């Protein structure tokens, strides 16, 4: 089901990229989210002052809040991977929220975006495991006793691959379902008269889904740091 009107799709059509505009909507709006976040970051970091401005204060509270929550899960040892975890959390939250603006499409409502984020988390999880344990990281997949290894190993492999599917479909399913409801309401009531309760619910869902993705990612990272038993 298509959004009734997508501003940047129309822009790309006007520039002569009709095929790309219709087949890569999620890519276009991922670029929009990236541009928005980069602009916000540049504006916030341009004039850092001892007495913070409103923008600086907002960014400091947001970033420090996410970081301290993550450290409460991973411990101080996990602070170094906050830039990746925090970036994923903020990117997903903004990607979810942007779909509430008439004429915009949430990139997370396309399965490609959640899948890409999930693959990044999957790869980085095992990077952490290898970084902390080296070749001994394989023990995470072999179980507590050696003679159960032939049984435990394939189960662990399937479990880790299932994490990608879990992260992907949880985020995609919720955002696609909400987007479909919004599309119907926009068509029935007009782009600027969608019922406010649904919009409020959309804001709640956007933050909850970003938080769940972030929390699960951090838990996977923390698990990779732990020693196998």
From Swiss-Prot:
Pfam families: ATP-synt_A. One of its GO terms (molecular function) is proton-transporting ATP synthase activity, rotational mechanism. One of its GO terms (cellular component) is proton-transporting ATP synthase complex. The keyword NADP does not apply. One of its GO terms (biological process) is proton motive force-driven plasma membrane ATP synthesis. SUPFAM superfamilies: F1F0 ATP synthase subunit A. Key component of the proton channel; it plays a direct role in the translocation of protons across the membrane. PANTHER family: ATP SYNTHASE SUBUNIT A, CHLOROPLASTIC. F-type ATPases have 2 components, CF(1) - the catalytic core - and CF(0) - the membrane proton channel. CF(1) has five subunits: alpha(3), beta(3), gamma(1), delta(1), epsilon(1). CF(0) has three main subunits: a(1), b(2) and c(9-12). The alpha and beta chains form an alternating ring which encloses part of the gamma chain. CF(1) is attached to CF(0) by a central stalk formed by the gamma and epsilon chains, while a peripheral stalk is formed by the delta and b chains. This is ATP synthase subunit a. The lineage of its organism: Bacteria, Pseudomonadati, Thermodesulfobacteriota, Desulfobacteria, Desulfobacterales.
